[in-house]
A protein has these predicted regions:
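Glycine-rich phosphate/adenylate-binding loop and adjacent beta-alpha elements
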Residues: 1-23
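Glycine/charged-rich beta-loop-alpha catalytic/anionic-binding loops adjacent to active sites
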Residues: 22-33, 57, 122, 172-173, ...
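Structural detector of well-ordered beta-strand residues that form the stable sheet scaffold
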Residues: 24, 60, 83, 149-151, ...
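Mid-domain Rossmann-like dinucleotide-binding core that forms the NAD(H)/NADP(H) cofactor-binding site
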Residues: 31-108
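Glycine-rich cofactor phosphate-binding loops and adjacent beta1-alpha1 units
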Residues: 51, 55, 93, 97-175, ...
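C-terminal hydrophobic helical "lid"/dimerization subdomain
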Residues: 138-142, 184-234
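Glycine-rich phosphate/pyrophosphate-binding beta-alpha loops
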Residues: 175, 181-182
Length: 234
């Protein structure tokens, strides 16, 4: 797999030509449907490593999509108690299957108060926002404990300004930061996580289509309830 130093758009090409020094090799038994997750896993490795999660910390992940569920798994590997904010019941169940300790629907009741109840009124030490909704980004700050860090993993769509209580950021010593894309190092670590079976990526594959059914694949992938959709050349 080519690390982050390889850029460009290759469409649905079955093969691309790159220099051998720019590749990480997977064991032969790892199928393409797993190795194709390398880039998203590397992005999440970058995110979680920046957080410096400590054993026993409360980590709250907003969003139960593919990137949110990868955050669940890596935060668990770091020894955190994981809380997931996700309105879809099926994705809540999937988050629990992948290691989430607590899941809840943020649209039901007072979400901020719920998180406080689960964390002895503190809030979460680390909050990852994996959704693109600016209103949810604002809520992420309210979930964050005193001295905690809010990570904006997702870009905003639309890219609107997010109102921020800077007084609370000051008085509660909160940190707001972002993470984007993998590095060469996190790309390598992603290959190790997948090759050694330390992350479950197969569960995140909603459906794989042969390239001859590409139109159907795009239509399937455009549905909001789907997870990962792949096109294979088998």
């Amino acid at each position: 797999m080519a690390p982050g130093c390889i850029s460009g758009f290759f469409g649905l090409a079955q093969y691309i030509a790159v220099k051998s020094k720019d590749l990480y090799k997977y064991p032969k038994e790892i199928p393409y449907t797993k190795s194709a997750f390398t880039e998203p896993v590397a992005c999440v490795v970058n995110s979680v490593e920046k957080a410096g999660i400590a054993f026993g910390q409360d980590v709250l992940i907003i969003g139960g999509g593919v990137m949110g569920l990868l955050h669940v798994q890596l935060a668990k590997l770091r020894g955190a108690r994981v809380i997931v904010s996700e309105p879809n019941e099926d994705r809540q169940e999937l988050a629990q299957k992948l290691g989430a300790n607590i899941t809840f629907d943020p649209a039901e009741g007072d979400a901020i108060e719920f998180v406080k109840q689960q964390t002895e009124e503190r809030g979460a030490e680390v909050v990852f926002n994996t959704t693109a909704n600016p209103k949810v980004a604002q809520q992420a700050l309210d979930f964050t404990a005193k001295g905690g860090t809010t990570f904006m993993f997702s870009s905003m769509h639309p890219n609107e300004l997010v109102p921020t209580d800077m007084g609370a950021v000051h008085s509660q010593e909160r940190t707001i930061t972002g993470t984007v894309s993998p590095t060469i190092t996190t790309f390598y670590r992603a290959t190790q996580l997948i090759a050694k079976g330390l992350v479950d990526v197969e569960t995140l594959l909603d459906k794989a289509f042969n390239y001859t059914d590409a139109t159907e694949a795009f239509e399937h992938g455009a549905r909001p309830e789907t997870l990962k959709t792949m096109i294979t050349f088998d």
